[in-house]
Design a protein with these regions (language model features):
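C-terminal beta-strand-rich structural cap/linker in extracellular carbohydrate-active enzymes
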Residues: 615-643
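Alpha-helical scaffolding within the catalytic cores
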Residues: 3-9, 41-46, 79-86, 140, ...
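Aromatic/acidic polysaccharide-binding cleft in carbohydrate-active enzymes
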Residues: 447-559, 566
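Glycoside hydrolase catalytic-domain groove-lining segments
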Residues: 245-251, 404-454
Length: 643
């Protein structure tokens, strides 16, 4: 059956598309405690690959490299700072702009109470002085890179990373009397950076980007907090998430509810509540288990009323599992053993009575089911009422997104997102609802992660990972955002890092190499993965000032989009996210007549290669109002007359 696709090219949905970009840290050439340092050839190879992949903006981590520890002063002439500047110059030589992460960890960065290297300007217990010193550091960085060294491709400052997932840095910072929340700490920092750059006459040199938060934990509070104050000085709004699992269709037991799934132990779902002392309440929700053999499961689901502590590495959550359980009272929780969870939807109810202490109360569920088999515990329809009352005390109990629910980690997803394209579109929609009208938006991190090969997402080194990335990129373009940034472009050696991530995953740290990219770390192996070619092909949509994007309408898991450069040249991108070949007929609202080059990424024939893979010779096709084609399974195709 033919798939009828259409490009709606009457009106663009984005008029200043900056392209598909990536996180690519400026580590090449930086010192390492084990001597794992790139040589010149490796530095050039990695930079050449970045250009070959069509990268236009590289977002990089940035350390306090300008500080000379031996001299205890900011010399801006240390070996590591010079190595970083050399990396920025290599990017400039290849036409790649830099989005500099000026700071990584909210609050903890400034007060030197996080895993990052201590900030030389920290004044213990003095937030305002430490913040003033930090803003000097940021402004002086702009001066040293752009004004002194002429590295004018440094165009963006990203203010922190995941400021809503700061661990316990806020609790141990010693400045809680001056910083009232995670949002407040980020806002004070970002606004102070803006003001310092204005004061020093450097604000026009860079754009400020943030808050770079996740769609989990305190979302959308960060956006709303900014809007309530002054949203104008932030130039680009950002957010991100990752796709690591897709669920089959699960019908909800109650109309209007959305179903979430926990697939790992240790998942908490909670909501702050204002409870009265010495009062009886009823907490209820629906639950079901999906597993082949429940007999082998261990663990449990614990639900009810808890007290949150502010000392957890994951933020403000209640404790259970391997820690002491922080119940609100002795009899405020109930437990269901894993094997006894129902196969079909069943409403669980927990009646509890509060005692005198009801401060820091939350109601929630701790999913701690364990076993060698893959499983899902589904939950929905949450409710809390005072006994004998019909007044609902929970907000968003139907789980229409994460609003009002705190500490929903990545492994907790909406089951209505049954395909990857919808997942990415919904992720953008959630963020755009909360940013000021007319502001630019970047999806500042994303990737598709297969946990031990879960059966519906490809591993990073498998050819279909290229298809997965292409689906995300088409979804981002059709959502009208200004840019997307893949985490990460390459597998990279983090200096002085020797860590390992979970061995069952093909991503994460392997002896300090952060494995997330489309090419191996050159020090370990001169190799590009098959997905490298898919990323290069999708970057044929171009990007830059004045580049327009037109929305595509697909069907049956075949997706399309179109970009057009200021000179009128265009690229149509089509992805067949099916396991079988699919015939297509693509039409345009406004007739397109042109000779286009057809570039194909076929997972069935794509392989990894050393060096920089040669670009395949395209097939030329004449387009006169429509494109007719047959796409192989998992194929990514670009029809283009862009250079």
């Amino acid at each position: 059956m033919q798939n009828n696709l259409k490009i709606e090219n009457n009106k663009p949905i984005q008029t200043n598309f900056l392209g598909h970009n990536a996180v690519y840290h400026g580590y090449a050439g930086v010192n390492d405690d084990a001597g794992r340092v790139f040589n010149r050839e490796q530095c050039e190879l990695e930079a050449d690959r970045a250009k070959d992949l069509g990268l236009k903006i590289a977002r990089t981590i940035y350390n306090f490299w300008g500080y000379d520890k031996a001299k205890q002063s900011w010399t801006w002439n240390t070996p590591d700072f010079n190595a970083f500047c050399a990396w920025v110059q290599r990017m400039k030589d290849r036409g790649i702009d830099i989005a500099l992460n000026t700071g990584w960890l909210n609050i903890g960065e400034i007060m030197s109470c996080s895993w990052r290297a201590p900030f030389p300007g920290t004044v213990k217990g003095n937030w305002q002085q430490s913040l003033q010193n930090f803003t000097w550091f940021v402004s002086e960085t702009v001066h040293q890179l752009i004004e002194v060294r002429g590295l004018t491709n440094v165009k963006y400052l990203v203010i922190m990373t995941e400021p809503n997932n700061i661990g316990n840095a806020y609790e141990v910072s010693g400045v809680k009397n001056e910083v009232h929340s995670m949002q407040d700490g980020w806002y004070q920092t970002a606004e102070a950076v803006h003001n310092r750059l204005v004061q020093d006459g450097r604000r026009s040199l860079v754009k400020l980007v943030g808050p770079n938060s996740t769609l989990t934990g305190c979302f959308p509070e960060f956006y709303d907090y900014i809007k309530e104050r002054n949203p104008d000085w932030l130039d680009v709004y950002t957010n991100h998430t990752y796709l690591d699992f897709l669920w089959p269709e699960v019908k909800t037991p109650v109309n209007g509810t959305h179903v979430f799934s926990a697939i790992y132990p240790g998942v908490r779902l909670q909501q702050d509540v204002a409870l009265k002392p010495n009062t009886e309440y009823e907490f209820s929700y629906y639950i079901k288990l999906n597993v082949e053999n429940p007999n082998v499961l261990s663990g449990y689901v614990l639900h009810g009323a808890f007290k949150t502590l502010n000392k957890d590495g994951n933020g403000r959550v209640f404790h259970s599992g391997g820690d002491d359980t922080t119940r609100l009272g002795r009899y405020t929780t109930e437990m269901v053993e894993a094997a006894r969870l129902p196969d079909d939807w069943q409403q669980l109810k927990c009646t509890f009575k509060t005692e005198e202490d009801v401060q820091d109360a939350v109601v929630g569920v701790f999913f701690d089911v364990k076993g060698s088999q893959k499983y899902s515990v589904y939950a929905t329809g949450f409710s809390l009422k005072e006994k004998g009352s019909n007044t609902e005390l929970l907000q968003n109990g139907n789980l229409n997104g994460f609003e009002h629910w705190f500490r929903c980690p990545y492994m907790l997803r909406q089951t209505e997102e049954q395909n990857a394209y919808d997942f990415w579109v919904h992720a953008v929609e959630k963020a755009l609802k909360h940013i000021p009208q007319g502001k630019d938006f970047w999806f500042d991190e994303y990737n598709i992660l297969s946990h031990g090969g879960n059966g519906n997402l490809a591993r990073l080194e498998e050819p279909c990972h290229g298809t997965d990335l292409a689906v995300a990129r088409v979804a981002f373009m059709n959502s009208g955002i200004q840019s997307s940034l893949l985490w990460t472009l390459f597998d990279q050696q983090w200096p002085n890092n020797h860590g390992y991530s979970d061995s069952k995953d093909d991503f994460g740290f392997k002896d300090g190499v952060h494995k997330f990219g489309v090419a191996a770390c050159p020090m370990r192996k001169n190799w590009t993965y098959p997905a490298y070619k898919a990323v290069r092909l999708t970057d044929r949509v171009g990007g830059g000032v004045g580049t327009k994007v037109y929305k595509g309408v697909g069907e049956n898991n075949v997706y399309c989009t179109m970009s057009q450069a200021p000179n009128g040249k265009l690229t149509v991108l089509v992805v067949n996210n099916n396991s079988t070949e699919q015939p297509i007929s693509l039409t345009f609202e406004n007739k397109v007549a042109a000779t286009l080059n057809r570039y194909l990424y076929n997972p069935a024939t794509a392989t990894g290669e050393p060096g920089i893979p040669a670009l395949e010779q395209p097939e030329k096709i004449a387009v006169n109002g429509s494109i007719t084609d047959v796409l192989p399974a998992g194929a990514v195709v670009a029809y283009t007359n862009m250079d």
